[in-house]
Amino acid sequence: MNANPKFLSADAHVDAAAVAPLPNSRKVYVTGSQPDIRVPMREITQADTPTGFGGEKNPPIYVYDTSGPYTDPEAKIDIRAGLAALRQGWIDARGDTEVLGGLSSEYGLERAADPATADLRFPGLHRNPRRAQAGKNVSQMHYARQGIITPEMEYIAIRENQRRAEYLESLKASGPNGAKLAAMMGRQHPGQAFGAAAFGANAPAEITPEFVRSEVACGRAIIPANINHPESEPMIIGRNFLVKINANIGNSAVTSSIGEEVDKMTWAIRWGGDTVMDLSTGKHIHETREWIIRNSPVPIGTVPIYQALEKVNGKAEDLTWEIFRDTLIEQAEQGVDYFTIHAGVRLQYVPLTANRMTGIVSRGGSIMAKWCLAHHKESFLYEHFEEICEIMKAYDVSFSLGDGLRPGSIYDANDEAQLGELKTLGELTQIAWKHDVQVMIEGPGHVPMQLIKENMDLQLDWCKEAPFYTLGPLTTDIAPGYDHITSGIGAAMIGWFGTAMLCYVTPKEHLGLPNKDDVKEGIITYKLAAHAADLAKGHPGAQVRDNALSKARFEFRWEDQFNIGLDPDKAREFHDETLPKDSAKVAHFCSMCGPHFCSMKITQDVREFAAQQGVSETEALKKGMEVKAVEFVKTGAEIYHRQ
């Protein structure tokens, strides 16, 4: 991969399409208990209800916003300088970290001294890395277990509630029918949650900072927030919160540049990526990651074994604990928020994959399996796990314990190798928690629908309710090019059953490296799956957006329908393919049914007739049927008429 001169020039910038506010939307900030707790949300403005339907005001709705300052017209975006260090003051105030004299990883120092990388380096970082003071633990779990509510926890509580209470109050104040309108728009179907301590058993109707603290303390949720990534906006991953999604980006040995990866990151968070994983395996991994982290308002995850493998020229058998340890420190000092570590791939499990249809499909899993077989020894990740915990708690890096033996086909789903590894991940979780290190567990993979719930149930049991983070799962293997759909089905199901974060799949899965369009398609598909899961679980306020869009649809407020949806651009594009004129944006029909057969228009006509006649809608329908019956007889009682 070569340096992109335009990207590295003084006027380097992100794609204009990624920084423009979404239609009829603006960035708003909700202030917490102190002035520097400013929680971003997206406010979507709505038009008034047409006079014929009552003429009431429709106040703005608020939705979760992952785009950081990029969609704020007031923010100055300079990717060479990076984002503001939002959390720096909070980290300083705790007084338990120390600023290092410089990088402490051997590889980091080597890259910094290499003149060949000078033009690739991120130029805007003017601070040295931090780590915990000797004997200190700086993890959010450690603070939570001490009974401390951090600013990050308060920030998250405000963010998860999405100003739902304020929205309902604004409905009540919207006019004489305000109370009735608030009751209608706030209505939500009861959810059905699964597993121990399922949502609703101990969760408040409104998320509080104390509830956030308690969920992190018991390990049921994590706040990925490395002290060296102060630019990140705090978020939480846990099944008693909104289901989150992750987007994967990263270069390979044959394609992509630093600039393209930063563009993918900003594009992913625009459409709703809650976290981003940099899975780069090509050249300049260190420099690419620095640019991404410094410009990312969301947590960044990595798979450190990928870079460690590059350091030994791709020979898995040449990997050592010392090389891997140095890689962990290198990435922790850059600010990576969570590491995928395949410590559950043990020597004893590798032979269990011999009878699989598709063997070991995880890159990290196959690397460690090859190392174990080459040395006929237990994995150094497993053997040195407690030492890894010491590194993690010094920077507050969260574990994402990797499923290196996940099934790569539905043929292999829920087999002995997969479940053996899952049980080991549960044992490792207990060790990490002993160090107050945050943990989530990665899950499959390819699983048919009838076996999905078993995965969730076993994970809750064996991993003691640590958050589950799954890739799909893909529910069938027959649709290359459509695996965002095959996996979206499984993602919605497992999210309902209790998975806390879903790793997106793009249409390019199994076929190639995704471009920006593929990233957007994967994000939107997974936002849909996550939201469907929130509805099914009965998460407080999950139905507000659905209700608002449905009301706009019934009232033919086309622009509001587009703007409240997950992808306003595509909705508008599809509508305009057949009805492009501005007048169609206020028409009481669309191109599917036309003006005479629109079910919603017919319903409105019935209501209008009922109001004029002073009768109920049921009586109006009865009278209407009687009139039509007379017409039918008068025209010859023929079902079909020849023209």
Swiss-Prot record:
Supply the alphabetized keyword list: 4Fe-4S, Iron, Iron-sulfur, Lyase, Metal-binding, S-adenosyl-L-methionine, Thiamine biosynthesis, Zinc
- One cellular component GO annotation, for this chain's record? cytosol
User: What catalytic activity does the UniProt entry give for this protein?
Assistant: 5-amino-1-(5-phospho-beta-D-ribosyl)imidazole + S-adenosyl-L-methionine = 4-amino-2-methyl-5-(phosphooxymethyl)pyrimidine + CO + 5'-deoxyadenosine + formate + L-methionine + 3 H(+)
- Write the signal peptide boundaries: none
Note accompanying the cofactor annotation: Binds 1 [4Fe-4S] cluster per subunit. The cluster is coordinated with 3 cysteines and an exchangeable S-adenosyl-L-methionine.
Q: Would you kindly state one Gene Ontology biological process term found in this protein's UniProt entry?
A: thiamine diphosphate biosynthetic process
Question: Which pathway does it take part in?
Answer: Cofactor biosynthesis; thiamine diphosphate biosynthesis
Give the InterPro entries listed for this entry: ThiC, ThiC-associated_dom, ThiC/Bza_core_dom, ThiC/BzaA/B
Q: Which residues bind [4Fe-4S] cluster?
A: 590, 593, 598
Q: Which Pfam families match?
A: ThiC-associated, ThiC_Rad_SAM
Entry binding sites for Zn(2+): 446, 510
Q: Name one GO molecular function term.
A: 4 iron, 4 sulfur cluster binding
User: What is known about what this protein does?
Assistant: Catalyzes the synthesis of the hydroxymethylpyrimidine phosphate (HMP-P) moiety of thiamine from aminoimidazole ribotide (AIR) in a radical S-adenosyl-L-methionine (SAM)-dependent reaction.
Share what the entry says about its subunit structure, partners included: Homodimer.
Question: According to its UniProt record, which protein family does this protein belong to?
Answer: Belongs to the ThiC family.
* Listed HAMAP family: ThiC
Q: Mind telling me what this protein is named?
A: Phosphomethylpyrimidine synthase
